[in-house]
């Protein structure tokens, strides 16, 4: 990946204009890219540091197509996007990374977990919820996760006992065994269209348990070197299994055993 590029004439479109989009846009501008943001909120955070904003929703095919057509490459701040028009344009040769087909897969946490499981990635025991009775398959306590739409702790619930079934998620979901966690770990993985891949430093996440949102990130993670290498290997295997192109955050549980 040690290559030099001239980005001075390249145009990048980013779907999503929140804080992550802003960070991405700031770095892109320093590298010389022309940056356009698609977001429904006028003067959103990312637009404040970019060259242009297209005001439109993430499910608006016309605005999505406009962004792709006006830029050399299009990428994503978030996965909650209508992929229909993007898949069509990707098939026509437009540079959209990660692939909208991968974004569509990532949108469904159950399908994502199923694929990683089939590729030999270690995952907690899980089961699709087809009926209320399925919620009791693993006993209690158990984790229930919405298949789609979850973020920042939303779409995830801990069912401690059978009495909690009245609070269960009504949308399409799956259950997952409750893991005895020592640490929550994350690593950013970058992979290009040639398949070259590299990892950022492994970090440790501390969560605010009241709202289940990451509150503190410790870099580098307080772990042994041998464990760091294993985490990197698993993370790389995940992105290769997805045939991902772009920068991905891989989150892992370090169990007590």
Which residues make up each language-model segment?
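Internal nucleotide-binding/catalytic subdomain
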Residues: 155-256
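ATP-binding N-terminal substructure of ATP-dependent carboxylate-amine bond-forming enzymes
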Residues: 1-102, 106-107
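Short, hinge-like loop/turn segments at secondary-structure boundaries
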Residues: 52-56, 92-93, 114-117, 142-143, ...
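Short amphipathic alpha-helix with an adjacent loop that forms part of the alpha/beta core around
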Residues: 61-70, 133-138, 166
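A conserved helix-loop-beta module that forms one wall/lid of the active-site cleft
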Residues: 98-155, 162
């Amino acid at each position: 990946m040690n290559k030099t590029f001239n980005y001075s004439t390249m145009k990048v479109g980013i779907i999503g204009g929140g804080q992550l989009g802003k960070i991405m846009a700031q770095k892109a501008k320093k590298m010389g890219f022309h940056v356009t943001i698609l977001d429904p909120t006028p003067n959103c955070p990312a637009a404040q540091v970019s060259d242009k904003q297209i005001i439109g929703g993430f499910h608006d095919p016309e605005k999505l197509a406009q962004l792709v057509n006006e830029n050399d490459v299009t990428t994503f701040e978030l996965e909650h996007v209508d992929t229909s028009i993007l898949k069509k344009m990707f098939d026509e040769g437009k540079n959209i990374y990660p692939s909208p087909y991968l974004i569509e897969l990532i949108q469904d946490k159950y399908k994502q977990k199923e694929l990683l499981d089939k590729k030999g990635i270690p995952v907690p025991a899980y089961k699709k919820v087809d009926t209320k009775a399925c919620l009791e398959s693993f006993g209690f306590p158990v984790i229930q996760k919405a298949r789609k739409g979850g973020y920042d702790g939303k779409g995830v619930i801990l069912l401690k006992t059978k009495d909690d079934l009245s609070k269960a998620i009504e949308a399409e979901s799956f259950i997952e065994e409750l893991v005895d966690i020592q640490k929550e770990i994350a690593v950013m993985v970058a992979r290009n269209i040639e398949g070259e891949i590299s990892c950022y430093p492994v970090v440790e996440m501390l969560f605010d348990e009241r709202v289940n949102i990451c509150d503190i990130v410790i870099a580098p993670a307080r772990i042994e070197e041998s464990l760091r290498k294993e985490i990197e290997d698993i993370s790389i295997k995940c992105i290769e299994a997805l045939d991902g192109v772009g920068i991905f955050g891989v989150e892992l549980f370090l169990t007590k055993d």
